[in-house]
């Protein structure tokens, strides 16, 4: 059957690629003629190549279906429907159904491959059986739906539904019954006119056969119900039992094929979605990166689907016994003839409007459907379809009498729907990558996924390709870069098969996950010793602590069978994590510049158990425990302040120890193991459990583990009995001689850089799982860097030498395992000077090379010139330069007493690192056993430096390195040195010219120039001041002159005023006796008016006033001016 499925998939893919002639012209646009791409349900793109979500094609198919319904006379089919004939015992249902299912599913997959949105109307019409019973049902329609003479009745149709629901619940017995049923009926062959509408449980894809296919759309719902009513009026009641028995035999024969078709079409839809994603990525510039992510998801699907069938059958069989008896008794009860006249009346305009509204909503209400389809939340989609199916079901139910409803099991829909819903959910839980991929959106607030570098998808988890990155605070940005790592605990992304990223989303390609599987297979092969209750079935859950989120409702320990793992699929993990990951981060405690500047001193509670032992948990308040577990998984860089006040109502008697993590003023975490060993001796761990004679004390066991096995912070396996014995029946004992023999090679080779050791990786993963599983008491979340406390000294050499750096934000990649400061954003000159001695030992021997661009990887720790792009292509391994001739100590092994013999990389004395030195390995092992740190550095700690005096390696053209030995990129080299005029003696010898002299000369010249500039500016300012002073003095003189002139003018004015007053008095006295007409005698009050009148009289000399004027002249003559 698998070969047939593959063959059908190949045929359908070829059919899907075959399109009408117009698709070749614009292969990236909608193939429907006249369609612009707008209004598509499946996405926002106008460049899809299929008809599956085109509203225009849907409308045309709808019109075609209506035209077929309105035809009054059609050519009758050679054979009648199976239900119309009553389906006798000898009617060959099984063999014919298999052939039809193969052809129909082939046509449906080729025509409407993965058409989930397009057939939403058909789902709503025929969903009652699927929504209630969760079973694929076949609806049969005759060639003449209006006036068919032999039509099936409502009773037989309802009995048929009950039989299908019952047979679906017996999925465990399908494999045996299929072979029997295939042999029972092989006689008649159906005609080509029979049309089957296969109702898929999740896809809802409709299939057509030949030119007589029938598509049921929402607008046709009223006609379909009426057709079913008219066709079923003429059937005799005696055919009910025959139809029921034959349909049960037919359904059992084809059920396995239908289930395979369901899985096949689901896979086809996934492949269609993958094709659409790949088409979009070709438009973008990150095609290779997204293809690698899709390969990860496909590999994860293959891994997860292996374990899913067991879970499905376990859940199916659990509900079979509860539902088998009532469902089987359903078809036996008789049912009177239903009244179908009521059905047409109940099918009112409201229902039709609702169907029309649902059809329009799939086209117009795009945002709602896009959100549902993008997230892939099948639960919401099923609820919507079930809701619509209930509306359609109300049309059929009023005409059915109570006896028939009880026959269908619809009187209590909850009882039938609930277990089948569970079966359906367990069936879809075997594809965790789809749910995880669609439910997790871009962490940028307000981002819908458009414009991303990695594709137009909102389900990525990183901020790397988000165009709205600038909207996010740097704290959240740095937090996501640190948190979103490989889901395998303890994995930094290094060594992955598909990429060296720490933000991948699957376990496929992870070397630690592979080691877990290998260790799990070894664990299964080990013989069980001791009491059978000491089950090792929980080893899988120990290796992956994320499963504790799902394992909240733990049954009693005795209910577990030996060697049987709990049936908890990891498929539901993404939904559980999304449910419990609604946490708030305390960004005030997060410092983006130096991670951990605040005094973080979390209490790390560790239990003295073996790496494989199952800790005793108290699940009395599993909701809080699940919340904290999900938070611990999703948030590894900040401490969760949302702690429940008490996660356990029982006293916690687990042996625990308090480890305070010290952070100095520079934000440096102390990762040494010796200080913690002293601290453990100073603060003994408190334990209320009585230790058996064969169990070491926590201090002694910890001391033993830290000295004999440096790669583990756990105690020896003999301390597994220290857990509480009242929680479990018996303590788990993994102290097997075979296990101890496997761990001996690890303890004897602590300096080996083997990342492929399954036992070492298994032990390390168990340790980090142990640190994450802290349900009881105060639940704290430690920084990801704190996990290096349990690593070996050899692993500390693989971290970034910058204090407080976890490897994120580096230029060469987001790796925490690089050994150089070249791309570290937190490194500065002071840190470079401090780490110069350590970084010089693990460099490429090529001068000026930091390890980037090498064929073997971006590592600075390689020991040969084989993959170095900067190495000379002359074939010389190491060409000694002048510097090496001057100082041959630079080309020797830095380990004191080593002559270069016995090295792993070759018998050369010219290497500069202790990575392959057997003497260094021996001394490092002795130092780790004695508890004292060993430094294999020679007395010459400076190492190869820039030959330019006073240069620390920063600012070079070829990189900011301390270890280059040439003047090629040195910014401090003098002009003569750059042209090669300086010899090696002149450059290197401090006797003739030291760096202080050079720097002093340059500083003196610069100071002299500055002094000259200051003098010039001072002189200019002095000249300006003199000019200003002269201007001020001249202005003061002018002011004095003006004041003197004003005084003179004032004096003149006073003299004139006195003279004027004297003249006015004389005039008054002279004219006192002369009176002008119409005026009083002159005085001081009317002096001005008198003078003006005289002036007018003299200007206008009137003959009448001549005498008066003469007299005035005579009187004024005596006045002297």
Swiss-Prot record:
Query: Does the entry feature the keyword Metal-binding, yes or no?
Result: yes
Primary location recorded for the protein, binned into one broad class: nucleus
Might you name a Gene Ontology BP term for this protein?
A: regulation of DNA-templated transcription
Q: Where are the zinc fingers (CCHHC-type)?
A: 21-64, 433-476, 477-520, 791-834, 835-878, 884-927, 937-980
Q: What keywords were assigned to this record? A: Developmental protein, Differentiation, DNA-binding, Metal-binding, Neurogenesis, Nucleus, Repeat, Transcription, Transcription regulation, Zinc, Zinc-finger
Give binding positions for Zn(2+) 6: 893, 898, 911, 917
Keyword Zinc-finger included in the entry's annotation: yes
* Residues in coiled coil: none
Q: Where is the composition biased (Low complexity)?
A: 147-156, 705-723
What does it do? Binds to the promoter region of genes encoding proteolipid proteins of the central nervous system. May play a role in the development of neurons and oligodendroglia in the CNS. May regulate a critical transition point in oligodendrocyte lineage development by modulating oligodendrocyte progenitor proliferation relative to terminal differentiation and up-regulation of myelin gene transcription.
What does the record note on quaternary structure? Answer: Interacts with STEAP3.
- The record's note on its domains: Contains 7 zinc fingers of the C2HC class arranged in two widely separated clusters. These two domains of DNA binding can function independently and recognize the same DNA sequence.
Q: What is this protein called?
A: Myelin transcription factor 1
Q: What is the lineage of its organism?
A: Eukaryota, Metazoa, Chordata, Craniata, Vertebrata
């Amino acid at each position: 059957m698998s070969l047939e499925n593959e063959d059908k998939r190949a045929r359908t893919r070829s059919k899907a690629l075959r399109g009408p002639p117009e698709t070749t012209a614009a292969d990236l646009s909608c193939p429907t003629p006249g369609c612009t791409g707008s209004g598509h349900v499946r996405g926002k793109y106008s460049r899809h190549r299929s008809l599956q979500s085109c509203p225009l094609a849907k409308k045309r198919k709808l019109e075609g279906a209506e035209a077929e319904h309105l035809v009054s006379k059609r050519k009758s089919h050679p054979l009648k429907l199976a239900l119309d004939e009553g389906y006798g015992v000898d009617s060959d249902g099984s063999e014919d159904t298999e052939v039809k299912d193969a052809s129909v599913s082939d046509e449906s997959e080729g025509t409407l491959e993965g058409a989930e949105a397009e057939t939403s109307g058909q789902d709503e019409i025929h969903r009652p059986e699927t929504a209630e019973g969760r079973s694929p049902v076949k609806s049969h329609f005759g060639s003449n739906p209006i006036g068919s003479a032999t039509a099936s009745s409502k009773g037989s149709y309802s009995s048929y539904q009950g039989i299908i629901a019952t047979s679906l619940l017996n999925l465990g017995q399908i494999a045996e019954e299929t072979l029997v049923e295939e042999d029972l009926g092989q006689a008649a062959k159906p005609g080509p006119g029979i049309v089957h509408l296969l109702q898929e449980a999740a896809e809802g894809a409709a299939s057509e056969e030949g030119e007589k296919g029938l598509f049921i759309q929402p607008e046709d719902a009223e006609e379909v119900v009426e057709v079913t009513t008219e066709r079923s009026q003429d059937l005799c009641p005696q055919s009910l039992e025959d139809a029921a028995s034959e349909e049960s035999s037919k359904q059992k024969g084809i059920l396995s094929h239908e289930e395979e078709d369901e899985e096949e079409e689901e896979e086809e839809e996934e492949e269609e979605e993958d094709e659409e994603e790949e088409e979009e990525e070709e438009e973008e510039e990150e095609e290779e990166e997204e293809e690698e992510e899709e390969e990860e998801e496909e590999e994860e699907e293959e891994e997860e689907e292996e374990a899913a069938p067991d879970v499905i059958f376990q859940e199916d069989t659990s509900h079979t016994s509860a539902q088998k008896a009532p469902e089987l008794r359903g078809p036996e009860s008789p049912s009177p003839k239903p009244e179908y006249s009521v059905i047409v009346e109940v099918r009112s305009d409201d229902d039709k409007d609702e169907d029309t509204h649902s059809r329009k909503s799939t086209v117009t209400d795009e945002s709602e459907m896009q959100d549902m389809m993008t997230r892939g939340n099948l639960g919401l989609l099923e609820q919507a379809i079930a809701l619509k199916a209930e509306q359609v079901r109300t049309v059929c139910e009023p005409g059915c009498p109570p006896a028939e409803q009880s026959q269908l099991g619809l009187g209590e829909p909850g009882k039938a729907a609930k277990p089948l819903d569970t079966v359906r959910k367990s069936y879809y839980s075997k594809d965790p990558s789809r749910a995880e991929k669609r439910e997790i959106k871009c962490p940028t607030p307000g981002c819908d996924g458009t414009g991303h570098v990695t594709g137009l998808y909102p389900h990525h988890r990183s901020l790397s390709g988000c165009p709205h990155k600038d909207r996010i605070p740097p704290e959240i940005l740095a937090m996501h870069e640190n948190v979103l790592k490989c889901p395998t605990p303890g994995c930094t992304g290094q060594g992955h098969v598909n990429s060296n990223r720490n933000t991948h989303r699957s376990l496929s390609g992870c070397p630690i996950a592979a080691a877990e599987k290998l260790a799990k297979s070894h664990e299964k092969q080990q013989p069980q010793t001791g009491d059978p209750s000491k089950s090792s079935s929980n080893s899988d859950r120990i290796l992956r602590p994320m499963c504790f989120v799902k394992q909240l409702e733990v049954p009693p320990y005795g209910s577990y069978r030996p060697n049987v793992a709990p049936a908890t699929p990891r498929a539901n993990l993404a939904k559980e994590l999304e449910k419990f990951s609604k946490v708030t981060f305390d960004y005030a405690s997060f410092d983006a510049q130096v991670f951990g500047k605040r005094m973080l001193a979390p209490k790390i509670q560790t239990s003295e158990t073996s790496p494989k032992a199952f800790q005793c948990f108290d699940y009395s308040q599993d909701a809080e425990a699940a919340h904290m577990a999900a938070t611990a998984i999703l948030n590894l860089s900040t401490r969760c302040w949302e702690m429940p006040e008490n996660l356990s109502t029982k006293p916690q008697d687990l042996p625990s120890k308090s480890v305070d993590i010290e952070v100095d003023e520079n934000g440096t975490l102390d990762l040494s193991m010796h200080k913690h060993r002293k601290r453990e001796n100073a603060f003994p761990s408190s334990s209320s459990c009585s230790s058996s004679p064969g169990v070491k004390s926590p201090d002694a066991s910890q001391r033993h583990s830290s000295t004999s096995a440096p790669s583990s912070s756990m105690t020896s396996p003999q301390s597994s009995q220290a857990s509480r014995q009242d929680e479990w029946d018996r303590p788990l004992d993994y102290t097997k001689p075979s296990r101890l023999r496997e761990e001996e090679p690890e303890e004897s080779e602590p300096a080996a850089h083997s990342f492929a050791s399954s036992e070492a990786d298994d032990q390390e993963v168990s340790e980090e799982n142990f640190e994450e599983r802290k349900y009881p008491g105060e639940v704290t979340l430690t920084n990801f860097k704190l996990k290096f406390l349990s690593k070996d000294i050899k692993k500390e050499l693989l971290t970034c030498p910058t204090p407080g750096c976890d490897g994120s934000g580096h230029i060469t990649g987001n790796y925490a395992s690089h050994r150089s400061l070249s791309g570290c954003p937190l490194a500065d000159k002071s840190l470079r000077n401090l780490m110069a001695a350590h970084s010089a030992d693990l460099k490429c021997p090529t001068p000026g090379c930091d390890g980037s661009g090498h064929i073997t990887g971006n590592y600075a720790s390689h020991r040969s010139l084989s993959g170095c792009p900067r190495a000379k292509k002359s074939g010389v391994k190491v060409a000694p330069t002048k510097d090496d001739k001057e100082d041959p100590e630079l080309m020797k092994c830095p380990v004191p007493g080593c002559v270069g013999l016995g090295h792993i990389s070759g018998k050369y004395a010219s290497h500069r690192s202790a990575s392959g030195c057997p003497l260094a390995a021996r001394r490092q092992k002795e130092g780790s056993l004695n508890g004292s740190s060993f430094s294999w550095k020679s007395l010459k700690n400076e190492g190869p430096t820039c030959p330019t005096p006073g240069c620390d390696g920063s600012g070079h053209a070829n990189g900011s390195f301390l270890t280059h030995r040439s003047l090629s990129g040195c910014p401090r080299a003098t002009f003569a040195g750059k042209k090669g005029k300086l010899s090696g003696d002149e450059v290197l010898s401090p006797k003739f010219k030291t760096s202080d002299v050079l720097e002093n000369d340059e500083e003196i010249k610069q100071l002299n120039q500055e002094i000259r500039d200051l003098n010039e500016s001072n002189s200019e300012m002095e000249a300006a001041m003199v000019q200003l002073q002269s201007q001020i003095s001249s202005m003061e003189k002018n002011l004095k002159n003006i004041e003197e002139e004003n005084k003179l003018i004032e004096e003149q004015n006073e003299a004139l005023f006195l003279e004027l007053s004297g003249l006015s008095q004389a005039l008054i006295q002279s004219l006192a006796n002369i009176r002008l007409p119409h005026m009083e005698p002159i005085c001081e009050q009317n002096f001005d008016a008198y003078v003006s009148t005289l002036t007018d009289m003299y200007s206008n000399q009137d003959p009448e006033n001549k005498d008066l004027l003469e007299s005035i002249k005579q009187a004024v003559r005596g006045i002297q001016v």
